[in-house]
Amino acid sequence: MHLYFSCFILLFVPGGKSLGINSHLKHMSNKSQDQVNRTRTVGSKDVAALPLSSYMFNLYQSFHHSELNHGMEAAPSLSLNHRADIIRSLAVKSYDHGGSLWTFLFDFSSLSQEEEHQFAEVRFDFRAFSDAILVGMEVIVDFFHQSSTCQSISGFCQSYLYVGSLTSTLWPRSSDTWVTFEATDIIHKWFERNDKGKNHSEGHMKQPKKLHRAKSAERRYQQRSTENPQILMMVYSNISKKEKLSGTATLLQDAAHSKYLAVMPGIQTIANSRRHRRSHIFNEHIMGMKHVPSADSSRTLCRRVDFFVDFKQIGWDSWIIHPVKYNAYRCEGECPSPVNERLKPNNHAYMQ
């Protein structure tokens, strides 16, 4: 039995995606699309299925080509990407623009305060707004937050959390049609509100002028979604120094300290973890797990043991040139699943 572990991070949450850097990027596009197709059938009915971001897949391919060519030409801001452990994209939930006044509505709840955030930028395809904006025009952008849990079949929630504003000049990149502008200050303001405990204060809950009516906002969003502008906020971050010093967690290390050593259907869902970087799907799958105070020393937890394969012994030696005998290893013992999320499985080594 072989266990394969992956060191990259790719989380699909409502309104957001993220990725980490490693060398296994070549065939990720098709696999990710299959995963999304599967998760759409089990997800909440209130959350609309989001199309996969072509920019994120181009980013995957850029890393793959840069590893093959050992160059720095493939990806936009590639030097910055290589300095980031995690690249997360947040898809806009709704937007509106009228001349120089713009309004973007994001869900920032997937951002983790435990990470070291280096940089953030907003990007969109200039061609989707070519009839409404001019090259070089200056715009004022208001950023609002709305959690995905506020979504319902009837429409958007009535209240939005104002995060901050910025002024930017719209210049398409010379190499493509993407318009980008820095939004690092918006991310910092979001975490400042969390630190001060004001993210639920009524003083910061208000109706943006461009989204003052839920029905109207929903209608405008549906009309523009057909153009698929792919307005994204890219957030570049590193894992914390403490987590780096602790080393990369593995599935076996996590299982050895897991508190979920027995399965009992019907138990309530365990409370959501504070670590938002983990997929929300994980929280849905830990229903029915019996909480045990600690691992019993009499239990034999999963470990790797020898498993020798001798082709001569099974009569295949005339077919096999090399190796005639090798150690394939196997897993023996009890392997509790899921692992305790309070540990640090930063390689996301969950059994598939």
From Swiss-Prot:
One Gene Ontology cellular component: extracellular space
InterPro entries per the UniProt record, alphabetical: Cystine-knot_cytokine, TGF-b_C, TGF-beta-rel, TGFb_CS
Sorted UniProt keywords: Cleavage on pair of basic residues, Developmental protein, Disulfide bond, Glycoprotein, Growth factor, Secreted, Signal
Gene3D superfamilies the UniProt entry points to: Cystine-knot cytokines
Induction field: By dorsal mesoderm-inducing signals including activin and vegt. Not induced by wnt8 alone, but wnt8 potentiates the response to activin and vegt.
Subunit structure: Homodimer; disulfide-linked.
Physiological role: Cooperation and regulatory loops of multiple nodals are essential for mesendoderm patterning in early embryos. Plays a role in mesoderm formation and may be required for neural development.
Family to which this protein belongs: Belongs to the TGF-beta family.
Protein name in UniProt: Nodal homolog 4-B
Gene: nodal4-b
